[in-house]
Amino acid sequence: IYDKYADKGIKLVCRGMGTTGYGEHLLAKAFRADYHTVETVAHTTGCQKFYPDTTFVLDIGGQDMKAIWLNDGVITNIMLNEACSSGCGSFLENFASNLNIDVKDIAKRAFSSVSPAHLGSRCTVFMNSTIINEQRDGKNPDDIMAGLCRSIIENVFTKVVRVANTKELGEKVVVQGGTFRNRAVLRAIEEYLDMNVTLAPFPGEMGALGAALAAKKHIKEEGYANGESSSFIGFEAVKKFEYTTQSGVRCEHCGNHCLRNVLTF
């Protein structure tokens, strides 16, 4: 975006920077962010920008998922699945690769299925054997992909959310995260819940949007930490940003003496 405007002679000025996600603190240090916030809050903030009446947010990313309940805009409950990726995007990508299906074609192939495989909600290890059994029973790659898209949703509602009645999700269910760019997964959740759900306008970027909005709000209420401008290092500095990595560095801060990767910038 910066280069696009620069080519037209327009200089963009960053009024504030926010970070979130797994690299929240690291990136905040590296690029001198004005504010950082946890993922659940960032995703909720991004969602409420477009849908203030949201009652339930389901974010499915590449490696984890987040389920967030809201009441009058206030978070009332959060459930996470961080230990297992069997209901996430990487899970789907890995099996698509095994079936020689391009990621971009997953939804198309899934919708082409006449008889989706019944795979259930299993971890990756057991899913492999289940898929082999389904293939032996005559299921083709399209059927397997359709079954996997359904399996992701089954995993969410049997392993993470576990609601007795879908009414517990409220009337406004919003889904986001890059996995929902796959329309077959979107269709799977609507079929599973037997209700219409709302797809966020920028599924894979809602957390980033929420972090930006949180930074904007923080600056408006608290002001800048240093002077009257953002502490962000600047777009040109980001383009030239360099760092070094040291692997296998022994940590001496406690008796565990773990091996760490150290990034220096």
Show the residue positions of the predicted features.
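Adenine-nucleotide phosphate-binding core of ATP-dependent small-molecule kinases
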Residues: 129-158
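Gly/Thr-rich phosphate-binding beta-strand-loop-beta motif of the actin/hexokinase/Hsp70
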Residues: 54-74, 250-264
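Glycine-rich phosphate-binding loop plus the immediately following alpha-helix
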Residues: 72-115, 128, 217, 265
